[in-house]
Structures are given as C-alpha cells and as structure tokens.
Amino acid sequence: MSTLQAVKYSRGNLEVLDQLRLPHEFHYDNVSTSEEAFDCIRSMRVRGAPAIAIVASLAHAVELHNGSCRATSSEEVISYIHGRLDYLKESRPTAVDLTNAINQLKARTQELAGQDRDAIIKAYIEEAENILEKDLKTNLSIGDHGADWLKDVAQAGPDGKISVLTHCNTGSLATSGHGTALGIIRTLQSRGWLNHAYCTETRPYNQGSRLTAFELVFEKIPSTLITDSMAAALFALQKETMNISAVIVGADRVVRNGDTANKIGTYQLAVLAKHHGIKFIVAAPTTSIDLETMTGEGIHIEERKREELTQISGATVGSDGSVDVAKTVRVATADQRIDVWNPAFDVTPHDLIDAVVTEKGAVVKGTNGEFDFSHVMPERWARLVGQQ
C-alpha cells in the first residue's frame, strides 16, 4: 500500500498535506480548529470527498480534545458540537461524504443526550477516529472488487493485461490511503493485470497533472499524462494497440438512480467511452451514495472563482530544466476581462455508467436499465427508501 498520506492524525493533533504545493514540495499544515479545517477544505489544500469528510470530522475532534467546548450541560455540549458541524458542512457542499459524516457524528452525540459533557466529547472523538479507520478498509475493498469486476468483463490483451484512463485525483491524496478509482488501478498493478494507466490533466485545477501523475510516478506504475481534450484521440488511435478497456473515476455524490457528480470533465469522458465501447466505472464508497436525492437534477453544483481558469501558479523552471520550488510565479492564461463559467463538477447520467464499485461489491444496472443499491447498503436502503 502507498505510504503517501493526505492526513496525519494522533489524538489531539491533525496535520494535513498542502496539496497545492505538490508535486514539487511536501508540506503539512497543522489544523487545530474548525475554522482552519474550513479554510483548508475551501482553498482545496485538501480535496477528495473522503479526505474532506475526514479532515472536517477530525479537526473538530482535535479542538474538542484541546478544550474548545466551554459548555457544561449535556444540551449545551451537543448544541455546540452540532453548530460546529453545520459550519463545516458549508465548506464543500457537493461532497456527500462530508454530509454523511456530519449526520453520523450528530446522531452519535445525540444518542448520549443527558449524559455528562466528557462522555459526549469522548464519544464524538472516537466516532471521528472510526471514520478515518473505516475509510482505509473501504478503499482496499473497493480496489479488490473493482479489479475482480474488470477481470471478468474487460477484454484483456494476449498478456492478460488491460490499460485504463482515470480523471482527477482519487488516490491516497484524496482519501485516508490507497484510494478509490486509483485504488482499483493500484490493485490491478499489484496483481499483474495492468498494462498502462493514463491520467488526464484535469483542468482547471490540474489535480490530474499535479496529484495523480505524482502518485503514479511515486508508485512506479506505468503511466502517461494527457490533456483533457486528448481523450477522444487516445481512444481512437490507441484503444486497440494499448488495449484500453476502462475509464475509472471517483465520485463526490452518487444519487439513487446512479447519476454521478464528479470533477468537471467526467461527463464528457463517459460519452467518449460509450462511443468507443470502453467500460465506464465509478468507484465510490457507500458513504458517497445519496439515497435521498432521486436524480442528478437534485445535485447542487459548486461554482468556483474565475481566476482558477484565467490564472495559474507554479514553480519556476530554469533554462536547464531544473525546478526551483522556492520560487513560484502566478501567470495569466487568458485575457482577464473575459467572462468565465467555472463549475467544479458535472453530472454523468446513469445510463452512461457500466458499474458503480463500492466496498460491498460492484453494482450494475438491472434489465430495466436502473441501478439498485439495496444489496450493498440494505440498512440505509430500508430506512430511507423502504419508508417511501
């Protein structure tokens, strides 16, 4: 398993890798308050739905451990905790993992209504730590199920290997470790089933070139970086020779019918994959599945500031090709007067998705063309869907 860590945690202390400095520099920020966590998430120093939920949950655990709560009564303590969680929820509203983690933490503390303040605080901290621990186990299971499913359905080459394309960053840097979509790629590689991995640049924030390419090189996985606009040409010209069999992406939110919100550019890859007969797979923990939202039309899509599209920062490169991480420069990539539309996510319709791979197994559409998640999350399904 990768030794890359987006989050370093021990009780009372949280460090978060500043991913804006990658791939040239490793720097961890101390995050000890909800305000610092909010800024860390909103500024995208940490990103990826699972990692966002983990940072928000643990940041409040750290401030509770360090004595931030002055309330004494049970009711006041619970009110304080829930208020901080409501604040953190607004840091990245599209990511359903954050909402689910907050609901889980609220429910756990509410169970202890009437008990003393220390018991409630202790329960919160333990529940937040459980979210971190469970995420890693979940990712390893997603990797196993995804690799198994692809081995069964993908057309492997003479050597039994396949090539895949991934988008954005869904690896150790987006989770507690191993990753979701990139976790499947890691598992394919470890089993000797991977020929080659392609990753998109993922404009405008370049998570693919800055983060995924970095992880692939770090893991010594055979890989190639392409721009987002090269995917169609890649499929047309190299699908057969490189045996490109799947596009594997993560998800910030999967709704009940399977429509999936993910990093902007995901939808167009699904359309291209369909046209070229390439499997399109969403890798997501069940915590990313939103059973309360029926279709993608109900997903709130975050829009980000215009400068992310018209400007870019990076380390300077010398005439000899050396990178000087001590010197960064911000440059304009467009006329600064141009209007900009900059949605952070798009929604891929479920009919373009071949499988949603969770820690409980791969879910495929039934004969009616619809996804049914009841068998991978029976309790939540019964509670939320069975009542309707």
Curated annotation (Swiss-Prot):
Keyword ATP-binding applies: no
Principal EC category: isomerase
Active site, per annotation: D252
Gene Ontology BP terms: L-methionine salvage from methylthioadenosine
Localization (cell): Cytoplasm; Nucleus
Main location: cytoplasm
Signal peptide: none
GO cellular component: cytoplasm; nucleus
Catalytic activity annotation: 5-(methylsulfanyl)-alpha-D-ribose 1-phosphate = 5-(methylsulfanyl)-D-ribulose 1-phosphate
Chain positions of site Transition state stabilizer: C168
Bilayer-spanning residue ranges: none
Any coiled-coil regions, as ranges: none
Keyword line: Amino-acid biosynthesis, Cytoplasm, Isomerase, Methionine biosynthesis, Nucleus
Pathway involvement of the protein, from the record: Amino-acid biosynthesis; L-methionine biosynthesis via salvage pathway; L-methionine from S-methyl-5-thio-alpha-D-ribose 1-phosphate: step 1/6
EC number annotated for this UniProt entry: 5.3.1.23
Annotated Gene3D superfamilies: translation initiation factor eif-2b, domain 1, Translation initiation factor eif-2b, domain 2
GO molecular function: S-methyl-5-thioribose-1-phosphate isomerase activity
One Pfam match: IF-2B
Family statement: Belongs to the eIF-2B alpha/beta/delta subunits family. MtnA subfamily.
Function field: Catalyzes the interconversion of methylthioribose-1-phosphate (MTR-1-P) into methylthioribulose-1-phosphate (MTRu-1-P).
Alphabetized NCBIfam families for the sequence: eIF-2B_rel, PRK05720.1, salvage_mtnA
Protein name in UniProt: Methylthioribose-1-phosphate isomerase
Source lineage: Eukaryota, Fungi, Dikarya, Ascomycota, Pezizomycotina
